Structure formats: structure tokens, C-alpha cells
A protein has these predicted regions:
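A beta-strand edge to alpha-helix "cap/lid" segment located at domain peripheries
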Residues: 21-51, 58-151
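Bacterial Sec-dependent N-terminal signal peptides
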Residues: 1-25
Length: 151
């Protein structure tokens, strides 16, 4: 009976270990979460964005012309909602890659944002952390990719 109890404890601990290793920071979840971030910006989903952003969030925009914290991002979304600003027609990500190290992950790729008259392509690099089993976006860096010169 004692051996059976020991086996149960060992199996239980092993399952907890596997479960902890398969937290929110995995390739599939992070790609889906990042796609949800893009969708939330397009749809001005204030609640989702507020819950996703870490308290220490920072967003460095193109050429560091603007650097936002969580409060600034949320205030901008509120302004867009209040003014019914729906100028962004689409946000499409491509070539998304994920790197995971411990409780930190980098998601990078390109987002094509169409606000008219022509879409603009941005390279992005976002840093996600796992905090008490929840994935949070703690940093975002975006840079416009210049259009190729026409021959």
C-alpha cells in the first residue's frame, strides 16, 4: 500500500510539472494571442487590451517618435471609441515567428495595416511574459517597412 501511495504521488507531481511546462507560453497559444491583439486593436476592444497588457507595458513606435505605456494605449483607444474612429480597415499579420525562453516569449513578424489610401507594412516584435499562469504583453516595438523603390 505504501508503494502504491508513492507511485500516486510521483505520477501526480509529474503531471503538475508537465502542466506547468505547458502554460500559456507555447507556439500555438502565442500566435493565437498575438492575432487576438491585432483583432482587438482593429475592433477597439478596450476590455481585451486592458486585460492583455502588463502594468509595465511599453510600446515603442516607428523610429521611437512615440513611446506609449499602458495608460497611453488605453486612453488612445477610448478616444477612438468616443470619436467613432474606424479608419483602420484591416490588420493582417504574416511571417509570424515565436521564440520562447523560460517565462518570456518573443513574437515577431509583419503586420499590414490598411487605413487608406495604401496599406502600410510594419515589422513588429512583441514580448510576452507568463505571470501566474497568464500571458501578458509587456513590450511592443513596431517599425514601418519602407516601400520598395519602383523601377
Amino acid at each position: 500500500m505504501k508503494l502504491f501511495s508513492i507511485i500516486i504521488v510521483v505520477v501526480g507531481l509529474s503531471m503538475c510539472s508537465v502542466s506547468a511546462q505547458e502554460g500559456c507560453l507555447n507556439q500555438t497559444n502565442l500566435k493565437a494571442l498575438d492575432a487576438s491583439w491585432e483583432k482587438a486593436q482593429l475592433e477597439l476592444d478596450l476590455d481585451f487590451i486592458e486585460s492583455l497588457l502588463a502594468e509595465d507595458f511599453v510600446w515603442v513606435h516607428n523610429h521611437a517618435n512615440t513611446i506609449d505605456d499602458k495608460t497611453a494605449v488605453l486612453e488612445r483607444i477610448k478616444r477612438y471609441i468616443n470619436s467613432n474612429n474606424k479608419s483602420t480597415k484591416s490588420r493582417t499579420s504574416r511571417d509570424v515567428k515565436v521564440i520562447i525562453s523560460g517565462t518570456t516569449a518573443i513574437v515577431r513578424g509583419f503586420t499590414i495595416i490598411d487605413r487608406g489610401p495604401r496599406p502600410i507594412t510594419y515589422h513588429f516584435m512583441r514580448t510576452y511574459i507568463e505571470d501566474n499562469g497568464k500571458c501578458c504583453l509587456i513590450a511592443n516595438h513596431t517599425m514601418a517597412v519602407p516601400e520598395k523603390e519602383k523601377d
